[in-house]
């Protein structure tokens, strides 16, 4: 039986790095750390505003979170904006802890999930250096005596009180609960808290219908497509499929527009 999980050596961030490098090599111009503040239709093109600068494009794929996309579409596609603005999100905080490997108990598997009925704040735990071979090698290189990396996540939809804690308080909570649940040492060598505010879209009953209606209404905003986890599912595979669908949509629209103009 093959492995249950698949990943990228060096972490998921490598996917964005390699994708950006591949696009740049093909002549694309990437503008990172640039916040888009406006989108409007002008003479059959889309004008994108970022700060004091503007650019004109034939087509735009909005792969931003639903709230940000709705804000950009509020004037040119108000119906779609209203529908996607209703998509709610949950926030999450990830606490990464480093432990001396020699003091770790014997752990089975690659981690575990914790249902809310158990009374703990932590909702999921990953034994990083046990799950990913590349992480284990990197940890051994950085700390020859051996380090075990454990990652835990906090924050459930509708119950974000735990996220109001400071980073130090969250790390202390993670250590306590991991010690109780899995017998991990009460003291860690190092810690890092990463917060992702409004990061996980929540799919209510009728989500697919609402997204379909929003997309159908974009016929009034030719050249614009929606893509991303807010609409088609979380996870890398779902986001890639969503992006490809959006790309095909705008390309098809551009081709049809070219035929009409030359027909």
Question: What is the role of each PLM region?
Answer:
Residues 1-51, 55-59:
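Helical element adjacent to the flavin cofactor pocket in flavoenzyme catalytic cores
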């Amino acid at each position: 039986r093959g492995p249950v999980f698949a990943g990228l050596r060096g972490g998921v961030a490598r996917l964005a790095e390699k994708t950006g490098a591949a696009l740049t090599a093909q002549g694309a111009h990437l503008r990172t750390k640039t916040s888009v503040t406006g989108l409007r239709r002008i003479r059959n093109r889309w004008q994108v505003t970022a700060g004091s600068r503007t650019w004109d494009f034939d087509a735009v794929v909005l792969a931003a979170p639903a709230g940000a996309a709705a804000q950009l579409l509020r004037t040119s596609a108000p119906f779609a904006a209203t529908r996607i603005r209703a998509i709610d999100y949950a926030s999450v905080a990830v606490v990464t802890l480093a432990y001396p490997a020699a003091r770790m108990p014997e752990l089975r598997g690659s981690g575990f999930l914790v249902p809310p009925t158990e009374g703990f704040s932590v909702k999921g735990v990953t034994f990083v250096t046990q799950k990913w071979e590349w992480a284990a090698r990197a940890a051994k290189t950085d700390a020859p005596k051996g380090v075990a990396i454990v990652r835990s996540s906090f924050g459930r939809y509708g119950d974000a009180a735990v996220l109001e804690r400071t980073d130090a308080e969250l790390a202390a909570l993670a250590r306590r609960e991991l010690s109780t649940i899995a017998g991990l040492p009460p003291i860690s060598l190092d810690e890092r808290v990463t917060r992702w505010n409004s990061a996980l879209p929540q799919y209510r009953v009728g989500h697919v219908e609402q997204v379909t209606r929003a997309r159908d209404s974009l016929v009034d905003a030719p050249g614009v497509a929606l893509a991303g986890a807010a609409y088609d599912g979380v996870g890398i595979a779902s986001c890639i499929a969503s992006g490809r669908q959006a790309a095909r949509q705008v390309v098809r629209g551009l081709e049809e527009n070219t035929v009409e103009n030359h027909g």
